[in-house]
């Protein structure tokens, strides 16, 4: 999967419907930054985890600035090309105010102090909006997460807001049957470009590796073929890549 989307697809791309159109749900969104890179020679995940300890100590020294930031370190596992990168460092914040307040602290103080000791060389950094469809059981610190990103295309006659509403309906039914997957629709504000014909990226993630299997079994047993499943339309996804990693920091 070529990781994520083009600048042209920001929020406005999904508000292509007429202003008078009424939708069932208000979009719940958050900002996320993806730092995608490879380890420096002789370095590995253990070194990055140790470096995170320095970062966390620095972040905690900044008062409440980073209280609303989560951090996860994800390693590619199922992928068509594992040579493209070793790791993704993912931060989430509720919105741009929290994101850019923290970013200013990082570039003016944190980066000069910690940048040289970072054991990773980043080859791509993405600034994204994520539309929250459903949430997993937990994202608390220490959670071993399983996350799958897939390229998705809209079908003719559908826009992102329509798809979001249908996906929310589906997720609500799935949760009533015991589903615990988190789901997000991702668009990039800057830093990435999608292949032609790809409109957004879908993230599906669970609070443990085993939980992903439990949810897959539940889908085939109780959800596939249901009215809610049949009503989920307007897009298709392919070219998925899966990651395993740990939640290092959750919202306070």
Describe each region flagged by the PLM:
Residues 1-4:
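Positively charged n-region of N-terminal signal peptides that target proteins for export
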Residues 8-17:
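Hydrophobic h-region of N-terminal signal peptides that target proteins for export
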Residues 17-113, 118-252:
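Short S/T/G/P-rich N-terminal loop/turn motif that feeds into the first structured element of a domain
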């Amino acid at each position: 999967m070529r990781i994520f989307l083009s600048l042209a697809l920001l929020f406005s791309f999904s508000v292509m419907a007429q202003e008078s159109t009424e939708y069932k749900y208000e979009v719940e969104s958050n900002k996320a930054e993806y730092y995608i890179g490879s380890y420096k020679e002789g370095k590995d995940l253990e070194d990055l985890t140790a470096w995170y300890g320095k970062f966390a100590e620095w972040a905690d020294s900044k008062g409440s600035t980073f209280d609303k930031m989560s951090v996860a370190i994800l390693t590619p596992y199922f992928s068509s090309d594992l040579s493209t990168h070793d790791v993704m460092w993912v931060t989430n914040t509720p919105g741009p105010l929290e994101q850019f307040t923290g970013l200013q602290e990082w570039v003016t103080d944190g980066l000069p102090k910690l940048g040289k000791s970072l054991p990773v060389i980043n080859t791509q950094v993405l600034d994204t909006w994520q539309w929250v469809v459903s949430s997993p059981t937990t994202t608390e610190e220490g959670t071993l997460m399983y996350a799958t990103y897939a390229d998705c295309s809209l079908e003719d006659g559908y826009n992102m807001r329509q798809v979001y509403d249908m996906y929310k309906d589906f997720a609500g039914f799935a949760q009533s049957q015991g589903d615990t997957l988190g789901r997000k629709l991702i668009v990039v504000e800057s830093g990435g470009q999608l292949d032609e014909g790809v409109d957004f990226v879908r993230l599906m993630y669970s609070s443990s590796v085993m939980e992903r299997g439990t949810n897959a079994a539940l889908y085939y047993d109780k959800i596939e073929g249901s009215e809610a499943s049949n009503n989920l339309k307007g897009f298709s996804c392919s070219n998925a890549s899966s990651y395993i990693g740990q939640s290092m920091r959750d919202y306070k």
